[in-house]
Amino acid sequence: MRIIFMGSPGFAVNSLSLLLKSKSEVVAVYTKAPKPSGRGQKPTKSPVHVIAEESNIEVCTPISLKFSAEQEKFRNFKPDVAVVAAYGLILPREILNIPKYGCINIHPSLLPRWRGAAPIQHTILAGDQETGVSIMQLDEGLDSGTILKQEKFLIEKNDNYKTLHDKLSKLGSDLLLKVLNEIEKQLPLKQNDNDACYADKVEDYKIYASDACEVAYRKVKAFYPKAFIKIENKRIRILDADFEALASEQGKIVNDNMHISLKGGTLIPKVVQMEGRNPCSIEDFIRGLKSSMVKKFIE
C-alpha cells in the first residue's frame, strides 16, 4: 500500500515510525515548514520532518494545499491512502478525493466529543473520566467524518497533558495499523452531530484568583507544563499540585508553603518553576523566596 503521511508534532511520531516498519510504503511525508525557535531563532524542523529525512523519504512543506500545482504534486505520488495526524493544514476536497481510500485521521478524543484543535486539554479541563482515539475518514467538516475505529481507556488521577498525550499517541498508532490492515473491511460509523462539542485552541494558561479550586487544579493538569500564577508581577509555573476542600479568602496565599485559597478549596502546589529557573519542589522554592511573597494574593 502506498501511503502519504501528513503530520508535524511529536504526537504523530509513533504512527510514522510504525508505518515505516510495516509492509506499506510511505511514499512522501507532508509536514509544517521549519519555523524559527530558541534564542537564536534558527529554523527548526518538526519531529516528523526529522524522522522522514532520516528514513530518506521525500518531505513536502507546502504553505497551502489549495493550489493546483500542489494538488498535482500530491496526485503524482499515486497514494492508496493518506494518513493524517496533527498535520496543521486544511485539506481541500481536491486532496481528500485523490487517494483510493481517501484520507484518514488519528484524532485523540472519543468523537464526536471534543472535535477541534485541543481535545486533550479540554478532556482534562472538563473532568472527563475517560478518553480515547478515533480513527476517522476525513471530510470537509471539522473532525466530522465517519469513524472507522475507536478505542477508549480510563483517565487516571495522576494523568496530565503529557501522560495522556503519550498514551493517546501510542494507542493511535496501534489503531491505525489495525485499520490499514483491514482497510477494505471497514464499516464506517456516522457521527451523531447532536453529541458534538468543540475543543478550541487554548491560549490562556493563567490560573486566576477568581477560578474555582477544581478548575485551577484541572488547569495544572491540562496545560502542563504551562499553567501559571502571577505574584507581584512574577510568573510562577505550577507543574504539579493537589487540592483540599478547606478555603479562606479567595486568591490569598494562606501559609508559608504557598497554599492558594480559591473558591471551593485550596490549591496545593507541589512542583513549581520561576521564569528563567529550573523546576523544583515547593519546599526548595520557598527556601529561596522572599518571605513577603508568600503572604500575598495571586493576580
From Swiss-Prot:
Coiled coil: none annotated. It is an enzyme of class 2 (transferase). (6S)-5,6,7,8-tetrahydrofolate binds at residues 109-112. It holds the Pfam family Formyl_trans_N. It catalyses: L-methionyl-tRNA(fMet) + (6R)-10-formyltetrahydrofolate = N-formyl-L-methionyl-tRNA(fMet) + (6S)-5,6,7,8-tetrahydrofolate + H(+). GO terms for cellular component: cytosol. The keyword Protein biosynthesis applies. GO terms for molecular function: methionyl-tRNA formyltransferase activity. Keywords: Protein biosynthesis, Transferase. Its EC number is 2.1.2.9. The keyword Transferase applies. SUPFAM superfamilies: FMT C-terminal domain-like, Formyltransferase. It comes from the Bacteria. Belongs to the Fmt family. Attaches a formyl group to the free amino group of methionyl-tRNA(fMet). The formyl group appears to play a dual role in the initiator identity of N-formylmethionyl-tRNA by promoting its recognition by IF2 and preventing the misappropriation of this tRNA by the elongation apparatus. HAMAP family: Formyl_trans. This is Methionyl-tRNA formyltransferase. The gene is fmt.
